[in-house]
Design a protein with these regions (language model features):
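N-terminal low-complexity segments that are often proline-rich with Ser/Thr-Pro
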Residues: 2-18
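N-terminal non-cleavable signal-anchor helices
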Residues: 3, 15, 164-167, 213
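Residues at helix-coil transition
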Residues: 3-4, 90, 150, 213
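Aromatic- and Gly/Pro-rich amphipathic surface segment
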Residues: 13-14, 22-26
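Functional-site microenvironments in short loops/helix caps that host divalent-cation chemistry
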Residues: 24, 28, 33-35, 39-196, ...
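Short, structured beta-strand segments at or near domain termini in extracellular proteins/domains
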Residues: 205-216
Length: 216
């Protein structure tokens, strides 16, 4: 685990949950080795290090919302708002799925088929660019790993029709938005308008993020 320190945003919070090799799923199956954390934290240098050089182009996983937020701030960027994420996912064409043509099959994204609630013990994330980009040139907006958004989650917030909305109200559950589905989730969760949420301090093998930065 890595703890935010100093004057960093959310100092004292756990940013990253480092997954171990050889774990088991809640159903008792052995977890795929590629679902371990492929980065480690060197306490001597105070820096992250790659455990496996072959994973350099894979999406980071096990990241909690705090860690994703802090990373974005460190690079003077931000997490996408939910509205920004959906706009990017649709590729300027109101796509149903955030693929190259708005349709979905297993040649276009890394996900777990069409049946809800089925865990894939052989599943794992894959390298970015393994599937075609969407019309904006963005890879893996659907599947691979869920992506944290900046907003707090509100069940009815996003249907009010506001332009470029950002939900800054924590609400009763204090959850943040995540979008895009993952290798471990079924096809419906990859829809460009499918919404999900989770607690800020939760990370696992299918939670990741991407950042946005204003063009200079």
């Amino acid at each position: 685990m890595v703890i935010g320190a100093g004057n960093a945003p959310h100092a004292g919070e756990v940013f990253l949950q480092l997954g171990e090799t050889g774990g088991c799923t809640s159903g008792g199956e052995e977890e795929h080795i590629n679902n371990r954390s492929w980065i480690s934290f060197n306490t001597s240098s105070n820096m992250f290090e790659l455990v496996d050089d072959t994973k350099a182009t894979w999406p980071v996983n096990w990241v909690k919302w705090y860690g994703a937020y802090a990373f974005a701030q460190y690079y003077t960027a931000s997490l996408p708002t939910e509205a920004q994420w959906e706009c990017a996912a649709q590729g300027g064409q109101q796509l149903e799925y955030p693929t190259n043509d708005g349709t979905l099959d297993l040649t276009k994204a890394n996900y777990n088929g069409d049946t809800p609630g089925v865990y894939n013990p052989n599943g794992h994330s894959v390298a970015v660019g393994s599937y075609p980009a969407n019309p904006y040139g963005l890879y893996d907006m659907g599947g691979n790993v869920w992506e944290w958004c900046q907003d707090y989650y509100g069940e009815s917030f996003y249907i009010d029709g506001a332009i470029d909305p950002v939900n800054t109200s924590a609400g009763p559950n204090n959850k943040r938005v995540r979008r895009g589905g993952s290798w471990n989730y079924h096809s419906a969760t990859l829809l460009t308008y499918w919404r999900a949420s989770d607690f800020e301090n939760r990370g696992n093998n299918h939670f990741g993020f991407r950042i946005v930065k204003q063009a200079e």
